[in-house]
Amino acid sequence: MIEQTHEVSDLSRRRFLKSTVVGLAAASTLGLGANTSKANESSAGGSSTIPDLAPQWKKLDLVEILSRPAAFVSISQNKSLYESWGAQGAEKHRERTSLPATIKVVNAARAANNFRSFSWIGYEVFRENYPQSTFDKVQYETWVEGLNFSPEKKKADNELVDELKALVQPGDLQFNELALQSSFVGTQLPLELSRKRVEVIVFTGIHLDWCVEGNTRSARDNGYLPFVIGDACDCQKPEDEPAALRRINNFFAPVISSDNFVKLLQQGAGTRKA
């Protein structure tokens, strides 16, 4: 598939978000979370774009909170986005930070004794067989215009990227997000979290300003305590990440780096041993 076709498909998926992102980013800089540090807008992503914790999160003992019953949730970290041949491969996420940072987060969560649930949630862009409204139908069709994928290639497009597939263990959940931007609608995730008495959800994935943010908002509205690992998430465009991270951090959840996540878990383990 030629690069131009990739770009048309990738841009169409985000087209209607442009005005929303601009408006919310402006709101976050006009006094909401005014103490948040300036992110490096020109950075290619990663920990340098992660804002300082918003004032409300600084009042919390994050070590204690991250020692509560927890779940790890990966969103849309599939071959579609990480492989050059994928439907969204032109975004070049393999060249960015989300994959190595996610591996770091998963390994740390596995080593902790309070992570009760691991979910690997796919997001298919080929959604012709999904339940859909009139809006969904035209949006889903627009995402894949010009793409000529066989059924086998469509299936491979939505497979978990190999580096993360190697980290999946028996008992982990693997399923697809069915709604536009929330895994809390129409999937087994709510029952999984409820049955395992989860309080905290740690999110990684793509796209930061779409499914990750949507799931973070849903987690808050359902009474959970979400964390977003900033360098383990990507927007479609790196330049959109600072605004998205600030917005999530100001309104919905603490945004921390993968290194800080590991340190907080280690501190919690040390406290329990003491």
Predicted feature locations:
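N-terminal secretory signal peptides
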Residues: 1-15, 38
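N-terminal export leaders
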Residues: 13-21, 27-29
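Boundary at the C-terminal end of the N-terminal hydrophobic targeting segment
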Residues: 33-34, 39-44
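Active-site acidic carboxylates
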Residues: 42-170, 264-273
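Internal catalytic-core helix/loop-beta-alpha segment
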Residues: 154-198
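A short glycine-rich beta-strand->turn/loop micro-motif centered on a GG-aromatic cluster
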Residues: 202-206, 223-238
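Short acidic-hydrophobic, aromatic-tinged amphipathic segments that line or gate anion-handling sites
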Residues: 254-261
